[in-house]
């Protein structure tokens, strides 16, 4: 079996590539990074190191690289005969690869390849595959859309694996945590006969995406912003401080109450165990993560539907507690990082505009009560 995977970065090689290889796929990695593509073609293999006791090595072979900037025709040809297409390139890049995927689907149609194909976006976003589908369909004519409707699925997925910041002399070397989770919405699949080992297939993905967003993303960001406020530079050092650990644990207790209220299929004890495992992952001494990486783009992370404001809104609607989340939001407005364009912009806005105006603009909140609470939280963190 052959897979085409867009994105030969650390997540692509260290998570998606590992899973595809373990399921017997030959993997065609697609990327514009010439160094990585050349190395894949020269060696046809690479090694993953688990960031865990023993630092186990995982060997991945039967791989090659395709440069979509220099040889798009080769990518189209690969999609035309692929058994599976996956991505791990970042949400903003999905629309950029959409024309190439559309050409690949047209080539499948021209070759009368009627084998069902799923295109799975493994991105840190909600509805990634369906978003990619929308972009792909913009580049298909009516006949192409009919072919895709019949034979091509775009099942949404939730993926979770921490890949720490790292530098290697070998461009293909990659280190990842031993925990991994990949969940696919089975209801959106076209090729239901192709199920990957270690991947979970579920009838409704939403609870799993929300669980990950409000546990891993909210918890990691809480650790980062609290740690930064208290003077730390790495997640590992920050989480050792009981103040930071308890802030993260408290934030997750609040999001847990929201998840249990929203989704009846979650068991409280199971969810608590899941979130405790999340906190243990942040404590992993083999993962050195800079706070500046985890806390980057604070304006985006303060957004209306993002990891803090959304649970705060929904907890308030349900009459549930959100005091730790609100306290963390106060610290986010004090985040200073000269190398982060959004952090610089946020501090400039706070200097030039009234605080309440910045809160409204950044969070999108209309609820006057919540705006007042955010304002009070920010002011309580003034030094």
Curated annotation (Swiss-Prot):
GO terms for cellular component: cytosol. PROSITE patterns: MANNITOL_DHGENASE. This is Mannitol-1-phosphate 5-dehydrogenase. One of its GO terms (biological process) is mannitol catabolic process. NAD(+) binds at residues 3-14. It catalyses: D-mannitol 1-phosphate + NAD(+) = beta-D-fructose 6-phosphate + NADH + H(+). Keywords: NAD, Oxidoreductase. It comes from Lacticaseibacillus casei (strain BL23). NCBIfam families: PRK02318.1-2 (NF002646), PRK02318.1-3 (NF002647), PRK02318.2-5 (NF002652). GO terms for molecular function: mannitol-1-phosphate 5-dehydrogenase activity. Belongs to the mannitol dehydrogenase family. The lineage of its organism: Bacteria, Bacillati, Bacillota, Bacilli, Lactobacillales. It comes from the Bacteria. InterPro entries: 6-PGluconate_DH-like_C_sf (IPR008927), 6PGD_dom2 (IPR013328), Mannitol_1_phos_5_DH (IPR023028), Mannitol_DH (IPR000669), Mannitol_DH_C (IPR013118), Mannitol_DH_CS (IPR023027), Mannitol_DH_N (IPR013131), NAD(P)-bd_dom_sf (IPR036291). Pfam families: Mannitol_dh (PF01232), Mannitol_dh_C (PF08125). Its EC number is 1.1.1.17. Gene3D superfamilies: N-(1-d-carboxylethyl)-l-norvaline Dehydrogenase, domain 2, NAD(P)-binding Rossmann-like Domain.
């Amino acid at each position: 079996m052959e897979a085409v995977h867009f994105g030969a970065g650390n997540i692509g090689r260290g998570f998606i590539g590992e899973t595809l290889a373990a399921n017997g796929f030959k993997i065609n990695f697609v990327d514009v990074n010439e160094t990585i593509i050349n190395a894949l073609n020269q060696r046809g293999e690479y090694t993953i190191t688990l960031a865990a006791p023993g630092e186990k090595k995982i060997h991945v072979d039967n791989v090659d690289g395709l440069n979509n900037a220099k040889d798009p025709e080769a990518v189209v040809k690969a999609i035309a005969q692929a058994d599976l297409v996956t991505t791990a390139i970042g949400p903003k890049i999905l629309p950029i690869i959409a024309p190439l995927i559309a050409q690949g689907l047209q080539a499948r149609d021209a070759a009368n390849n009627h084998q069902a194909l799923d295109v799975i976006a493994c991105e840190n976003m909600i509805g990634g595959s369906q978003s990619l589908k929308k972009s792909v369909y913009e580049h298909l004519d009516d006949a192409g859309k009919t072919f895709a409707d019949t034979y091509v699925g775009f099942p949404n997925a939730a993926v979770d694996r921490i890949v720490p910041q790292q530098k290697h002399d070998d461009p293909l070397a990659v280190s990842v945590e031993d925990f991994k989770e990949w969940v696919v919405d089975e209801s959106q699949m076209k090729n239901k006969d192709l199920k990957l080992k270690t991947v979970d297939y579920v009838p409704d993905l939403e609870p799993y995406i929300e669980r990950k967003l409000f546990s891993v993303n909210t918890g990691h960001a809480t650790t980062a912003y609290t740690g930064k406020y208290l003077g730390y530079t790495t997640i590992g050092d920050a989480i050792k401080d009981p103040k930071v650990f308890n802030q993260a644990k408290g934030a997750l207790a609040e999001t847990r109450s929201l998840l249990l209220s929203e989704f009846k299929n979650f068991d409280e004890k199971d969810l608590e165990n899941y979130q405790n495992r999340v906190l243990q992952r942040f404590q992993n001494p083999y993962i050195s993560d800079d706070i500046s990486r985890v806390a980057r783009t604070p304006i985006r992370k303060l957004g209306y539907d993002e990891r803090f404001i959304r649970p705060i809104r929904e907890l308030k609607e349900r009459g549930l507690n959100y005091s730790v989340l609100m306290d963390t939001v106060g610290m986010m407005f004090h985040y200073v990082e000269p190398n982060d364009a959004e952090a610089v912009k946020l501090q400039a806005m706070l200097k030039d505009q009234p605080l309440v105006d910045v809160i409204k603009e950044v969070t999108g909140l209309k609820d006057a009560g919540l705006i007042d609470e955010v304002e009070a939280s920010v002011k309580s963190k003034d030094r």
